[in-house]
């Protein structure tokens, strides 16, 4: 279907044997996202960066066989993920909503915060996604609901997956637009057209809606709170505001995440994320934060000519960053990692932040969203019920 419609998809393959999985990964190029074909919720899904990690995954995490194949997808580094929900009566097709994920593609859609409307996508990209969604709905003869997950990289639109069913985003969009997509779709399935139902997906004017995932980490303090392809969230909240920053800040508060607006920020990021520090570090300093960082990140920040205090990694001896966290000497943690060993080595940092209720983000996209949140003045926030917004 994608070939027929001339739509783009990241390179992928299906493996029924160990050796076949290795060969596919070599052909499409690492890193790849691997997952069993027979699970939901991202269970046992993993981002692997090299052949050694893939071999470990195949040996320890899953069984590969003819009846239980493994799916491998090329990982689109730094891509923006987008959910698009569509409702159709078989003739007329409408876009219910376009939700831009805050965390980059590769984080499970159930765990990523989302913005409705999109907060940084160009009009051209949004129009292209709408066109592709409508073309796919026509090709599949959809009557009812359909969800498409897109990835946007360098202004190019890629299909991640298409689900001809309701998705977890439907209730959120329905609350925002004041129109139940499930109800509209159900009536469409029994023959009532969208036109007869006078369906509209128009958002209330001048408002942004942000979904934030609610995590169960408070109940499981020894679990690593790092986000990845496997879903960990157990709920979600909605933040509403006149702009993305305020809506995002309210969503964090609703999810019981405490955003301290000044103090000390600890930054330790993977090499591929260091380029983002050129913009992020000056902005977080302007907000009112002092910076502490481990050696590699501190070297990069010093090269920018910006102030930074060095702190030891746990492996470098005490006093180290975990001591700082446990002594409540840090107010915000920015920690991105790459590779199994790096994730394991830095787990104590994220767990210590969790235990001390220190806000921790494990993506740079999430870090920039925090900057937007800090730009909103909580003293000026207003609150409205959904009934008031959608009357």
Please state what every model-predicted region is:
Residues 9-12, 70-72, 148, 308, ...:
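Generic structural signal for residues in well-ordered beta-strands
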Residues 1, 5-6, 28-31, 40-43, ...:
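ATP-dependent carboxylate activation and anion-phosphoryl transfer catalytic cores
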């Amino acid at each position: 279907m994608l070939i027929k419609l001339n739509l783009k998809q990241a390179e992928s393959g299906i493996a029924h044997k160990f050796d076949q999985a290795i060969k596919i990964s070599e052909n499409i190029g690492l890193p790849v996202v691997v997952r069993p074909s027979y699970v939901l919720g991202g269970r046992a899904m993993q981002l692997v960066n090299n052949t050694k990690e893939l071999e470990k995954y195949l040996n320890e995490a899953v069984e590969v066989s003819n009846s239980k194949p493994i799916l491998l997808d090329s990982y689109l580094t730094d891509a923006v993920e987008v959910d698009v929900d569509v409702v159709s009566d078989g003739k007329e097709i409408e876009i219910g909503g376009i939700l831009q994920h805050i965390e980059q593609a590769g984080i499970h859609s159930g765990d990523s915060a989302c913005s409705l409307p999109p907060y940084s996508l160009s009009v051209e990209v949004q129009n292209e996604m709408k066109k592709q969604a409508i073309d796919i709905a026509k090709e599949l003869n959809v009557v009812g609901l359909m969800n498409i997950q897109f990835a946007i990289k360098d202004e190019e639109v890629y299909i991640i997956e298409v689900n001809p069913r309701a998705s977890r985003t439907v209730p959120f969009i329905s609350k925002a637009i004041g129109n139940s997509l499930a109800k509209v779709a159900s009536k469409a399935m029994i023959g009532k057209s969208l036109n007869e139902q006078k369906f509209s997906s128009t958002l209330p004017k001048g408002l942004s809606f942000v979904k934030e995932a609610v995590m169960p980490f408070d109940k499981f303090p020894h679990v690593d709170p790092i986000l990845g392809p496997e879903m960990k969230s157990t709920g979600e909240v909605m933040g509403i505001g006149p702009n993305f920053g305020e809506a995002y800040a309210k969503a964090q508060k609703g999810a019981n995440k405490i955003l301290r607006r000044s103090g000390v920020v600890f930054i330790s990021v993977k090499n591929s994320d260091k380029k983002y520090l050129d913009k992020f570090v000056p902005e977080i300093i302007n907000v009112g934060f002092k910076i502490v960082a481990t050696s590699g990140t501190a070297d990069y920040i010093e090269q920018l000519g910006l102030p930074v205090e060095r702190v030891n990694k746990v492996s470098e001896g005490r006093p180290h960053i975990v001591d700082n966290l446990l002594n409540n000497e840090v107010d915000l943690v920015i920690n991105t990692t790459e590779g199994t060993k790096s994730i394991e080595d830095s787990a104590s940092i994220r767990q210590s932040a969790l235990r001390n209720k220190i806000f921790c983000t494990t993506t740079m996209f999430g870090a920039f969203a925090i900057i937007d949140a800090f730009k909103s003045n909580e003293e000026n926030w207003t609150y409205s019920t959904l009934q008031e917004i959608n009357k």
